[in-house]
Amino acid sequence: MANTAPKVPLPERRDAPEVIDQQAAKLVNLINKSKHFIIFTGAGVSTSAGIPDFRGPEGAWTLRAQGRSRTTKAVSTLQAIPTPSHMALLELQNRGVLKYLVSQNCDGLHRRSGIRPEMISELHGNSNRECCRDCGKEYIRDFRAVATYEKTVRDHRTGRKCTRCGGVLHDSIINFGENLPEEALKLARDHAEEADLCLVLGSSLTVTPANEIPEVCGARRSSKLVICNLQKTPLNSQAHMHVYSEADALMTRVMARLGFPIPAFILKRRLVIKTGVDKNDRQVIALNGIDVDGTPVSYLRSVKLEYNRRVARSEPFTFNFRDALSPGTELKFELEFMGHYNEPNLVIDYQVQGDGAPEAVYDLHYDPNTGEWMTMRE
């Protein structure tokens, strides 16, 4: 992997709006004919969210090469709103048009936008994801789950332990010189081999071996490679078309021509409330966040039970009851979130389940534009 850039970055170029319109029409024609359409994203897909790229005029490696500091304010990846491009990809996934997504980005915005875990290879990791190397259990955090690297960049320990086996948790970030995750890379290559159309959004395609994924498509006559990037790339000669444009400018036109809406970003959380019995035969109620595939997600700061002075401030969020609660007993839990999107507290009405139904699952949807929660019980 390359962690450098020239002192003078490659010039950026922007096609005229009417040219982008024409190229969007051509791309839509390719998408409509495609049987296995994949997308490869780089930092340029997140720049409109306020997250800097690497090799643009204000890119991280460009600034390092020039020995100067950033002149524009960057947005925290935890507070960044997924861009129109992120949300367009979500809509394409949900409609079955997009078959697979490969990303070089560590910002976690694809997953936060709603891309399903089985639909994406995050080749360089995810700053919100950590895992146990002993048992393989993964965890998603609503905070930066990255090691300090105080001793060495090869030390990926985050300081937390696996709740399943007690093993040490490691971040998922791939630092320069490290191998890419085998399974994610294999899935990316498999889909690239099957793809008849690959769209690159916002990548300079200079970082190996990730750039080999779109190259697989560009090298085959049976597939077409389309690149959307403001700078030239090493794969331009293999590309069927290069759109010199921001990702959002192209994707908004593509979605309009496809007749698909670009959905607004909704922060989606899943909450599981379980009842059980502890070693002292006391009834226990536990609250936990999960992802769509059951992966634990840490997004709660605290949980408070109505008429109970105790506030649970760390995972697992549990409440013990000396006397057993009868089925049908109603409880109110007040959830406090991390608040990266200014989420207000939310009160969950829970009815104690009988022995046959010890678990209740809630879908919690938050709209950052209105500041309101919507709660649905499955």
Q: What kind of region is each of these model predictions?
A:
Residues 345-349:
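Short, compact, well-ordered microdomains
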Residues 1-306, 312-314, 320, 325-330, ...:
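Conserved catalytic core of sirtuin-type NAD+-dependent deacylases
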